């Protein structure tokens, strides 16, 4: 099953739609890869394996029942630890939020779930996403996938490393001055910085909204675009969306 981890997100989505693979198989494959790879890298700081297994079983049933399937149906996805996730620890990389568990998903995460994406874990970020590296006092540093003792860039470094090592096919990120693009370059993956307002950034100070954006990451351009299509949308809490 571990070979599934190395396929592109678009290929995996097609395989799920054709019933060639099960979302359960895919999630278990990603969990196995995380457990065997991440000890040396520290990319997935809050795994959500039980949650992912439950959602994978529901996704499998939907496929077998012939239900309409979303863009991301059955795909495991990492969420940067700046984005609020219902019932899942969201620290923002800060000791101030070390025990913070939001009651609801923010809009970008809700959109991913609505398209069938399965949250498999939260990925590391510097405190409040401020930095061209990925380290904080809550979880420590994330290593480069090619040389763990070196930097992976930032601030979406946890997502970039998880993608580069096949821990998951898709992951979210954010970008103010390079936080999607820098770690993508350091890790050999793709990060797309959308125009402001394409992906609603609920909860950000209004003064930052024209500059700080949420966006997708993948191992290929078409994968990142697939995630972007799910993330995007209007949100009343973001006046720029």
Predicted regions and their residues:
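An N-terminal boundary/leader segment
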Residues: 1-54
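Short, well-ordered beta-strand elements within core beta-sheets of diverse protein domains
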Residues: 12-18, 97-101, 212-219
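Conserved hydrophobic/aromatic pocket- or pore-lining residues that grip, position, or stack substrates
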Residues: 30, 52, 74, 80, ...
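Long amphipathic alpha-helix in the N-terminal Rossmann-like dinucleotide-binding domain
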Residues: 50-60, 116-117
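Immediate post-signal peptide segment of exported/extracytoplasmic ligand-binding proteins
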Residues: 59-76, 223
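Enzymes and membrane/adaptor proteins characterized by extended Gly/Ser/Thr/Asp/Glu-rich
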Residues: 71-108
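Short glycine/serine-rich loop segments
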Residues: 104-231
């Amino acid at each position: 099953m571990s070979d599934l981890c190395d396929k592109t997100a678009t290929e995996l989505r097609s395989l799920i739609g054709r019933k060639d693979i099960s979302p359960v198989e895919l999630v278990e494959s990603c969990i196995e890869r995380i457990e065997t790879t991440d000890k040396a890298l520290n990319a997935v700081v809050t795994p959500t394996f039980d949650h992912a297994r439950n959602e994978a079983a529901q996704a499998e049933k939907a496929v077998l029942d012939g239900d309409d399937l979303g863009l991301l149906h059955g795909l495991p996805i990492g969420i940067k630890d700046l984005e609020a996730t219902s019932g899942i620890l969201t620290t923002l990389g800060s000791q101030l939020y070390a025990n913070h568990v939001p009651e609801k998903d923010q809009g970008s995460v809700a959109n991913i779930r609505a398209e069938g994406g399965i949250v498999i874990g939260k990925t590391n970020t510097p405190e409040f996403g401020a930095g061209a590296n990925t380290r904080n006092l809550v979880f420590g540093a994330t290593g480069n996938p090619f040389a763990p003792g070196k930097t992976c860039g930032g601030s979406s470094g946890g997502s970039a490393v998880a993608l580069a090592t096949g821990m998951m096919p898709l992951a979210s990120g954010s970008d103010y001055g390079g936080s999607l693009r820098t770690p993508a370059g350091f890790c050999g993956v793709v990060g797309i910085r959308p125009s402001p307002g394409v992906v609603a950034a609920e909860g950000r100070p209004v003064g930052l909204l024209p500059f700080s954006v949420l966006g997708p990451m993948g191992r290929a351009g078409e994968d990142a675009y697939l995630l972007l299509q799910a993330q995007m949308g209007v949100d009343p809490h973001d006046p720029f969306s």
